Amino acid sequence: MPKYRSATTTHGRNMAGARALWRATGMTDSDFGKPIIAVVNSFTQFVPGHVHLRDLGKLVAEQIEASGGVAKEFNTIAVDDGIAMGHGGMLYSLPSRELIADSVEYMVNAHCADAMVCISNCDKITPGMLMASLRLNIPVIFVSGGPMEAGKTKLSDKIIKLDLVDAMIQGADPKVSDDQSNQVERSACPTCGSCSGMFTANSMNCLTEALGLSQPGNGSLLATHADRKQLFLNAGKRIVELTKRYYEQNDESALPRNIASKAAFENAMTLDIAMGGSTNTVLHLLAAAQEAEIDFTMSDIDKLSRKVPQLCKVAPSTQKYHMEDVHRAGGVLGILGELDRAGLLNRNVKNVLGLTLPQTLEQYDITVTQDEAVKKMFRAGPAGIRTTQAFSQDCRWDSLDDDRAAGCIRSLEYAYSKDGGLAVLYGNFAENGCIVKTAGVDDSILKFTGPAKVYESQDEAVEAILGGKVVEGDVVVIRYEGPKGGPGMQEMLYPTSFLKSMGLGKACALITDGRFSGGTSGLSIGHVSPEAASGGTIALIEDGDTIAIDIPNRSIQLQLSEAEIAARREAQEARGDKAWTPKNRQRQVSFALRAYASLATSADKGAVRDKSKLGG
């Protein structure tokens, strides 16, 4: 029978000092012996996805204590990728994932907490907490802050839906008036919550449902809606049950590594492909799998991407649907229900509610459930009122979107495409693979060949795009922006958005060893591995080289002979200490970022730290 971890600090005469300090936090004699549960919050006023989380930790804590546990709350950092985008701040985004994971480990292990409730929401916070949860392997439940309502405004006498990406594109489009750009900017992000499309934050919060670590509705129920409060209340109650099951009944099925199994990871990736999630999710699932000691690699993702269709299409791949529409169509369980009927899921998995996948679908799939409360929950909709307050409205759609032929979520028969929303490409300068969000690629450019325009930084590429130096048919290559080379693997949302601003969204390709925002669409290929700074062939591409992209056949090729590539590699090595570094880039890199770069692996490994360098 496992012993409560917290007993290390609460039992025995020699722990009198620790108990004295616990008493100073408000604990009493009756609390010693109860499970101590960490409420891992991430409130900050810097991030709209987290600005409303201040009081939500207290909600969870109250339920923990009412259910027989002791709750102790702390916060992690949280970086807003959108605000950090397009300048040196983006160097810090991906490294913050590792800091978040480590900080959770530090706090939980230093204080011997028995379990956790993770209150996350945005891009690196959910992955960081997920990595920590699987590393620590103590009972955990995730409950996120929820999606933002979609922006809405009237342009040319037509009401349109908006999000952050629209503001970025119109702000750089010389054909758009100042008044219209200002109108879009003011309308794009109307409420608290994670950005309203299927960007990285919402993708990851959906995937925690598929992994079994969060409750139904977690990925799609709006941050502003009153119904979301119940997820927090339930999490506080349920975590005490899970904790007691493990420590008092020796039930290891309550542990995250047994819930988020290899089968669950495959289901999560299947969901990701079917819903056209952010390419960043690939990076984060690979990293989380390593923490769980699960053999889940790019090869597994490649195999899944070849058989899973696209059943859901959401912004940025279309402006017709946002997360509020996904929720109305049944949310994550709506998509999983269609995948299950298509025979594409592993059914022998459970979630934090203790339900198997078939049991969960029977209760929460809107096309089969008889539970009116569930149907009511999925009718939770937007209010269209600017606010930073959680649970501030109770608006509902008049009806559910259960049209699987022409609605937001489709059945296999009516899939948006037989190929899924993400694909892994391989070739002679992406030997270990690269990722493209096919959901956002126009059919006309699924095969694309063109001359390379090579840039050693995102900044240089942006200047060239806005300066008219990139023209129709070009393949923009941005290198030395990988985990090590950046360092930090910057997102390339500005270059892709500015290509659209210049009318080149369907006329050019962009390839990088960096990564893309979940808000990116177009022929944008990232995560090229090995990266340039690790000796990747992407470092050998020169202006004018022909690059051939063939998404249907999962191929990407630099059209040079092996002899020419070998000669260029020899010339690169001859640079000595300067080999595999950018030639003319001026960039200030802090000690903290240099420390990150010294251990960073390429994207095909999840950009995690290279344990072999630490002897581990």
From Swiss-Prot:
PROSITE patterns: ILVD_EDD_1, ILVD_EDD_2
Transmembrane segments: none
Record has Metal-binding as a keyword: yes
Alphabetical keyword list: 2Fe-2S, Amino-acid biosynthesis, Branched-chain amino acid biosynthesis, Iron, Iron-sulfur, Lyase, Magnesium, Metal-binding
N6-carboxylysine: residues bearing it: 124
Biological process annotations from GO: isoleucine biosynthetic process; L-valine biosynthetic process
Pfam family, one: ILVD_EDD_N
GO MF, one example: 2 iron, 2 sulfur cluster binding
Quaternary state and interactors: Homodimer.
Annotated protein name in UniProt: Dihydroxy-acid dehydratase
Protein source organism: Salmonella newport (strain SL254)
Gene (UniProt): ilvD
